[in-house]
């Protein structure tokens, strides 16, 4: 049943956008989700994990069928506007993103690669005051050198090109 739902989602997204999706995120995975994503093929990555800060090759990857994982986040995520201990205002969201960025930027300047993933949903962050906090954050980030703001598909393409799968890396 999960495979059928996945195939239907791919069909619908392809029909609506004119392109097949290149990444996958379920959000509520089952024991077979990643295997089904690999078997379905055609994906550059999936984001159904919260276990790391950087992309990595799935442990089931093979040279013939490498599978990239780009972790998602619940930490720097606008879903926290819906939680009791989450964000109460756009200022909370901005400050949290800024603090996360500042720590990662400093670590990156010391030579450690970093990635800040921000979970955004139009029904949450698309509210005027919340959107203003995102605009402020983007302006803040643009004031720093050597920062790349990218979509997940761009990160996946970069990772495939720059850090290709090898059995030794896995």
Across the structure, where does each feature detected by a protein language model lie?
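Generic, low-specificity signal for short hydrophobic/alpha-helical stretches with a mild N-terminal bias
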Residues: 6, 19, 79, 86, ...
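C-terminal domain-boundary segment and adjacent tail
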Residues: 45, 98-170
């Amino acid at each position: 049943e999960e495979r059928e739902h996945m195939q239907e989602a791919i069909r619908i997204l392809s029909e609506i956008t004119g392109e097949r999706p290149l990444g996958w995120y379920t959000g509520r995975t089952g024991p077979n989700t990643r295997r089904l994503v690999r078997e379905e093929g055609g994906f550059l990555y999936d984001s159904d994990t919260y276990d790391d800060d950087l992309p990595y090759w799935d442990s089931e990857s093979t040279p013939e069928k490498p599978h990239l994982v780009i972790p998602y986040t619940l930490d720097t995520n606008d879903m926290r506007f819906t939680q009791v201990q989450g964000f109460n205002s756009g200022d909370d969201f901005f400050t949290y993103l800024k603090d996360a960025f500042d720590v990662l930027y400093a670590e990156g300047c010391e030579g450690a690669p970093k990635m800040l993933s921000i979970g955004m949903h139009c029904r949450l962050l698309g509210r005027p005051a919340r959107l203003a906090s995102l605009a402020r954050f983007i302006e803040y980030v643009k004031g720093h050198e050597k920062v790349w703001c990218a979509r997940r598909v761009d990160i996946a393409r970069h990772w495939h090109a720059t850090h290709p799968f090898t059995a030794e890396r896995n």
